[in-house]
Amino acid sequence: MNLFSNFRQFGVFIAICIAIFTLNLYLEFRSYEAFKTKPYNFIKADLLFSDKRQGKNSKYYVLQFKSDNFIFYTRSKSLPKCSSCEVGVITKNLKFKDYITGRFFLPSFKISKLDINDSLANILKNTIISQHQNPKMQELYSALYLATPMSKELRQNVTHWGIAHIIAISGFHLSVIFIFVFFVARFTIAPLQDRYFPYLNLRFYISLILFILMGFYLYILDFTPSFLRSYIMGVVGFLLLSRGLKVFSFGNLILAILIGLAFSPQLLFSIGFYFSCLGVYFIFLYIYHFGNRSDLSSLKRILMHTLILEIFVFLAMNIPVYYFFPIASWYQISVIPLSYVFIIFYPVSLFLHLFGIGGLFDDFMIRFIEFAPAQGKANLELWQFIGYNIIALLAIYKKWIMLLLALLGLFVYIFALI
């Protein structure tokens, strides 16, 4: 059973989403106009990361700051000695098309320390950082738990392993956290339920509480695009499942995308949101063409489908990923077994950080992260990227087109390495 009983209902939903999107776009434009009322402005922002660069005559720092409304980059000759700063910026050349993306460059003329109480996100970040001596490990775990930006060097390290999507908080993390906490809570509360409230649907209420907590986590992460998409899909799926409606469908993916874009127009320009939606699309595509309810009764078939699905998604995502991040390595294929290792590693590492011993595996982790080198480069043109996305959409209609996606991804992967 589907959420919309006819096309008219779906059309009304789309019209509502367009209206909300238009309203939010207008509000963003008003915010942009207010921000540009003066040729310069002072912004209260948190310093997310710094990257030292070599210029023609001297070295400088590229700084990334996060304010309440957006993230911006600037340059400085020296590294600011503050985590919460007041940044004087020049706004006269800022365009709305850049402002609406939520990430842009602003020239700065002054950076000073701001004496304010740290936000919860900063407190958590400092708690994580304090448990690690190595700066790269500080970045890694901050990115893993709080979706903070990674330096160019660390980003290259995780790209060589093909695990950027594992580090970036997404639906994978939501699933791991949800399943882990759900089963712990279920087996802890079940004896009490049997004795005191046997009439309650324990799974429903545990799931409801977990989604509320995940919503608070999403707020702490400042609505990270990939996690936002997965959260919307999770909530929609939960509501559909509780009412006996179909969960795994392309319509529900479209539903989540439309809701996300309606309330946050910036997602139109988010690569992370695009990757997140495309990854789920490929999962649904495999289920659509190869899914069979009878296979759920066999553990062997479940494991077989899981492995094939992992391989298919890895190959199908190659062309979109390489268009934006062209570095290729033979080690990237190890992301398939590493995904299963991560299911154990993620809750264990989180548990260790809760007890202040998060740096227990740092020596091993730093050697592992830096082990994989870059071995090739995939140079893709815009027309190839657009053409591949069109083929991906057509794969809904034919199974052989879906298989073609994997073959094209395999071809690009091998060609980049030979």
Regions found by a protein language model. Give the residues of each.
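Positively charged n-region of N-terminal signal peptides that target proteins for export
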Residues: 1-9, 247, 398-400
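Membrane-interface helix/helix-cap signal primarily in integral membrane proteins
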Residues: 2-165
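Alpha-helical transmembrane segments
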Residues: 10-20, 145, 207-214, 251-258
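Short, charge-rich amphipathic segments
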Residues: 18, 107-118, 168-170, 269-273, ...
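Solvent-exposed, charged interface segments at domain starts and junctions
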Residues: 18, 141-144, 183-187, 324, ...
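Charged, low-complexity, helix/coiled-coil-prone segments
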Residues: 24-34, 84-86, 117-127, 153-154, ...
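Aromatic-rich juxtamembrane segments at the membrane interface
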Residues: 111-230
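Internal transmembrane alpha-helical bundles of multi-pass membrane proteins
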Residues: 223-418
